[in-house]
Design a protein with these regions (language model features):
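Catalytic metal-binding/acid-base residues of hydrolase active sites
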Residues: 25, 61, 150-152, 187-190, ...
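N-terminal, active-site-proximal structural segment of metallo-dependent hydrolase catalytic domains
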Residues: 11-71, 84-89, 164, 269
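Active-site-proximal beta-strand elements of phosphoester/diester hydrolases
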Residues: 16-28, 92, 104-109, 142-152
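Metal-dependent phosphoester-hydrolase catalytic domains
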Residues: 157, 161, 168-181, 188-269
Length: 269
């Protein structure tokens, strides 16, 4: 009897963690045919098809987050609105598979000179925030950290100082020095920017290190942008990336489910 040889990646048979960073594009009537109501089902389809352990979203208004919460029953989320620390403004929420993970500790801080209170920092055009969680794998008992953010699109000083603050806060928050750390977000900066110098001393780049990867752009501007802007990133530590993928395929119900493509990282634990 011949053995069946199946084309299943080796990592698919092992203990992995899948992380997706997704700028879902805020809910605004100015997007014409690309308004949230026309693509919200496609965002849900993407999550159900990709089945990430962690879905880290940016630009999510509460109405959008509430829709995801109600239509993705396998997930729970942490995160607050950046404009008031409650439901106001955009959320950098972390959705996690509740069958596999539980929250041990979580929090939020603002990217400003006064990070522990709702505030706008430096030359930023908007309030900016980081949501983070310390999670326990219910099956293995292992722990990990996940941080999610969105840097300012205008303030150059704000982006630079924000990366410094994030790097420092990760050092302060992470007590479990052996636990995997994931940092996701829309950084509004190419990885070649020198703003990342302090962060690269602490965390590594999933896109660069994964043996299966791509070099595709992540910002599409609803099709108007040249596919060269790589501004969404996944950083990590204490894990082994085996796959990085820009989810730009027309397989979720419409060609563009946001003005950013989701990015996906798969890591061996």
């Amino acid at each position: 009897m011949l053995a069946c040889v199946c084309a299943i990646p080796v990592f698919a048979q092992k203990d992995t963690t899948t992380v997706i960073s997704y700028n879902i594009r805020l809910n605004t009537p100015n997007d014409g045919d690309n308004i949230w109501d026309n693509r919200k089902d496609c965002s849900v389809t993407m999550v159900k098809m990709e089945r990430p352990d962690f879905l880290c979203v940016q630009e999510a208004y509460f109405v959008q987050l509430d829709y995801l919460d109600k239509n993705l029953p396998d997930y729970q989320y942490i995160g607050v609105g950046r404009d008031d620390g409650k439901h106001g403004g955009e959320h950098m929420a972390i959705l996690y598979r509740k069958d596999r993970f539980e929250v041990v500790e979580h929090g939020d801080f603002w990217l400003s000179e006064t990070p522990d209170v709702c505030s706008r920092g430096w030359d930023a055009a908007c309030h900016r925030i980081v949501t983070w969680g310390y999670f326990r794998d219910k099956k293995t008992g292992k722990h990990l950290y996940c941080f999610n953010t969105h840097l300012d699109h205008v303030g150059e000083v704000a982006r630079r100082e924000s990366v410094k603050l994030i790097t420092q806060r990760i050092k302060e928050i992470v007590k479990d020095k052996k636990a995997p750390i994931y940092l996701t977000g829309d950084f509004n900066s190419d990885i070649s920017s020198d703003i990342f110098v302090p962060l690269k001393k602490v965390l590594k780049q999933a896109r660069k290190d994964a043996p299966v990867t791509d070099n595709k752009g992540t910002y599409n501007g609803w099709g108007s942008a040249a596919n060269i802007f790589v501004i969404d990133h996944i950083f990590y530590k204490n894990a082994k990336p085996v796959l990085f993928k820009t989810l730009d395929g027309n397989i979720y119900g419409r060609p563009l489910i946001s003005d950013h493509y989701p990015i996906k990282g798969v890591f061996l634990n």
